[in-house]
């Protein structure tokens, strides 16, 4: 019995250490967002620098065509015009490949880039790489709002998919209002 308990304890410790090893800290609010260059569902390359001067909603999600990820993506899709009115671009990121993203974007009629981070470098740089069941590496469901100067303006951690886009939109409106100079007549 004690041997089973000891083996279980060791196995749990290894899983915890393994999960911790994959973890990297997310960039803090106010610091420069980590640079990236990734392909979208059409094969087009996107770099963070391409969006300098615009607000960027960079959302990480675990897996294409899963219930929560589909809900999250479709809510961003349904609010796309509100984001565009604020001059914001939406970029989704997961560790799935370009082909998986292509099928997902087509099936859900997504009007924004879904970036393939198959090498998991960007997901790790943003501190969202996590291990599911201690084995499979996926992106944690986090969202970053990046300001027009390329700094992290807000970070949502381990979000619930339902209603998340509305929360991001509210935060983005508040941030944009603070940085837009008031006009007087």
Each PLM stretch: what is its role?
Residues 1-9:
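Bacterial N-terminal signal peptides that target proteins for export
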Residues 14-35, 180-183:
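N-proximal helix/coil linker or "cap" segments that precede and/or mark the start of modular domains
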Residues 27, 36-55:
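A short beta-strand-turn-helix
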Residues 33-34, 55, 140-142:
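Short loop/turn microsegments at loop-to-beta-strand junctions
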Residues 65-110, 118-122:
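Structural microenvironment flanking redox-active thiols in thiol-disulfide oxidoreductases
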Residues 138-185:
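Thiol-/selenol-based redox modules, centered on thioredoxin-like
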